[in-house]
């Protein structure tokens, strides 16, 4: 059992998870990762996906459905479907969707949500969850330290259609320059990735206890920085995709015992299969929000998450609650002092778009840059709604000589959601779907 898993890993989970290790090791060793979910974001058209076989609803997210793909060999990739490109739906691993449930609880409790930070945002699934709870007038900063992963985040946000996100490239341990700025912070910590062994076996080959301890030291630095950036009364969601205590409960307990952070109170139904931290460590109160998703027990990959609050009595910050939200450019300039704002970040005009590189000029008369995504549909703009075949061709970059095209800029839509732009000048037609997002023919 577990022949390809590191021996040291097996010994450790057997010690730390005595009642759950057998199911965990068996699942990691013998089962294929199949717990993908499709989450509806706008109108939902998952049945366009070849071989799509919907399963049950995800218990902790009622807009997400488990699915499989019958005869998956040779089928088109998920991202090649126009519904995905239009932002109608998003595919995400099931356990990570627990973040949505935690955010629901925070909203019910009246937690502040006007200034949010996703500290390790790529590829963007949890950023989308934060956007669901961002109030009108709020701003979300999505930060990613790795250059090649910023492009993934950029594409996800373009498809989402949000105009309230500033993307930045910043190390997660470098937020102390904005003391007490954020109402809420989500950090999906860099970790040893033990929860992904079933999905990525190569991760097990690179695993070692020394690597786990090195990452735990980095996590500690990140927590120091994020704590400074969190306002008194604010909240923090801590997450990893690993099992070891040193990267999870071991990180949080010093903050709790010192009184600098307080765990939120939240319970989950037992039949969801999540394992509470108190089962493994008696220092945790069963009412405190901290759980593991354990393959073999939970219908999801390995994942840990917890919710904590910064006491109101903590030192006040230098940023009055509303001061920096009146104009997005103010926040952008504040961030520029501390880090690189990715591709200009959020434009300074009221309907700013998050990624100027993806924007297409919509005539000199309008003086702004329309974007891909569902919010690019504007009154008075020439619109051509495409069927599945034409939408696929458009996303491949083909120039479609459609009779409905008017001279100038035309917005291509799919099921009413914006895909991108075609430009016609007489008999000449040019496809302006971003090259970085085009799907293979």
Give the ranges of each region predicted by the language model.
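Conserved class I S-adenosyl-L-methionine
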Residues: 111-122
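A short acidic, Gly/Pro-enriched loop at the edge of an enzyme's catalytic core
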Residues: 111-112, 174-188
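Polybasic, low-complexity RNA-engagement segments
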Residues: 1-45, 49-50, 299-441
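Mobile active-site "lid"/loop adjacent to the S-adenosyl-L-methionine
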Residues: 148, 186-225, 237, 241-248, ...
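Class I S-adenosyl-L-methionine
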Residues: 180-182, 235-238, 242-335, 340
